[in-house]
């Protein structure tokens, strides 16, 4: 068992097992842990091993090769037939041979399942409080504090500080927004972290200066044709239409749709104003985090459950250190080699898959699962699956579902608590408390701001400024790491290129002649089979760009506006949901007589009116495009089958990619076979575009196998979302009949 850990240590002398007295504190999953020594692979025998050269990290489990793994790419330890290869530079990345990992482009991606807007979080918090009050359960109530009356001088000083931090926040937000907007206009892709920062900054700007809605938004709409003309890289390069008018309309439609979606996201990011709020949420969170970090005082279970909801998956994963990311990947049997962005991306996709599975399992019931299904579900969530009884499997899975779905604890916190060195005897609240202690300080700042926004309280400008500056520093650090990787890769490639291009020397002279001094009988021959299939899966960034261009070309040939119509319908649903959430909040507050204290911000009201106007304009553009296409440009056969306008055959995709640029036949077959999940010879273009946009937003390198897994995850989320919509519709109809 010890060899599983010790074989991957960094060669710092012979390792030995430490005595139990030398064990590190429980839950020590920090930068000092040597997480390259952890091997959390299957789940049979559980032991904690400590070597001389590192501190303890993950628990270690044995693994049987006969057990199927639900992982992104099976590690070489799990499959004996997979060839090993060294790291090789490719473009500006370091990649591992085998399934190759490629960066692709895109801007928007599908929203993760269950990702709530700010108003939805406020509504859930309000419903939870009212429900506990009706049931007579425990409701968190802050201790009564003695109000100290401030002197006149102290009040003036506080006001001066408030305006100072407010103007400083406004200036910094303006600079960051201008820089990111310039990057967008010049065709650069914002990462997920940058887009989230840009969205929050725009919401802050409209909150600080509501008058900007009358100036900025109409100015942006007026300049759309100019922007499209001056910055052609803002849109995909393949708008190869025969009609200049149709091309102009499509570009205008695309930009208006993106702008309307962004403005709606900005509206949902703005918090409601609660005039009755006393600013207790920020103080309560600060006191809670001070207890678990400094004083050592144990918070109540209600406090732990209440504040744990604020540490969302995206916030937690974006701020974890690399050792913690590697530990989580090994716990979930994911690839632990790659950039931080790649590790976060595959963790995000796994958490999205687990979230969808949790809802499906909860609907069917844990008791309906077989033993193998229980083991697979527990193993996928980082829990013990082998060597335990069926009752324990059901018990720990039910506890997981209760914490995740009923108490709404983020999946990332639950997974992180299982990656730590914690005994099974600890209660869920104590496990969450120990997990929160390991999170970086920046996560606490973000959660503190979110706590005030959810309660509808006025966010302190100083706290908002600190969170913005910390997030900007993290973004700049990512850029520096990216530039450093690119420079190192270019430095490794440059000597090889210079040697291969020496003037006056033929290529044959570059290699010295080898003298055969070894007898033929002593020459060792490698009899292992050569795995040619791995080479066929190598896909470059250029080939992915060609795939994106081919999709655009095929959609143009089919005159398909399916994606635009679908996005417009989703935008209309978001607007309607926002309006319904506002009404529900007022309805919940009417139970306590506080509905008069809540109101929508001025900037939010103005933006909502502008989005409604843009939706009408987009409807008109789509109608105009359809009319243009029906005037002799659309094939009658295609017009008679609207259901298949987004479905193409594998041969059509291969033919379109060949027309753009020559690609080897085996690569085309490998790529299309990975995209054709059900092997029926057909591919949905819209689903393919969603995958490309999703990966492009993360700026990571993935393999063809992972493309198929992303498609499966998106389909699973769509299935769960359809069930939830049908359930909500049935509940609304039942409520209407009852009333």
Swiss-Prot record:
It is a single-pass membrane protein. Residues 717-739 are annotated as: Disordered. Residues 115-207 are mitochondrial intermembrane. GO terms for cellular component: mitochondrial inner membrane; mitochondrion. The keyword Metal-binding applies. Pfam families: LETM1_RBD (PF07766). Residues 229-739 are mitochondrial matrix. Ubiquitous. It catalyses: Ca(2+)(in) + 2 H(+)(out) = Ca(2+)(out) + 2 H(+)(in); K(+)(in) + H(+)(out) = K(+)(out) + H(+)(in). Ca(2+) binds at residues 676, 678, 680, 682, 687. Keywords: Acetylation, Antiport, Calcium, Calcium transport, Coiled coil, Ion transport, Membrane, Metal-binding, Mitochondrion, Mitochondrion inner membrane, Phosphoprotein, Potassium, Potassium transport, Transit peptide, Transmembrane, Transmembrane helix, Transport. The modification Phosphothreonine is found at residue 191. Residues 1-114 form a transit peptide. The keyword Mitochondrion applies. PINK1-mediated phosphorylation at Thr-191, positively regulates its mitochondrial calcium transport activity. Inhibited by ruthenium red or its derivative Ru360. Residues 663-698 form the EF-hand domain. Residues 115-135, 445-492, 537-626, 707-738 form a coiled coil. Homohexamer. Interacts with BCS1L. Interacts with GHITM. Plays an important role in maintenance of mitochondrial morphology and in mediating either calcium or potassium/proton antiport. Mediates proton-dependent calcium efflux from mitochondrion. Also functions as an electroneutral mitochondrial proton/potassium exchanger. Crucial for the maintenance of mitochondrial tubular networks and for the assembly of the supercomplexes of the respiratory chain. Required for the maintenance of the tubular shape and cristae organization. Essential for early embryonic development. Belongs to the LETM1 family. This is Mitochondrial proton/calcium exchanger protein. The lineage of its organism: Eukaryota, Metazoa, Chordata, Craniata, Vertebrata.
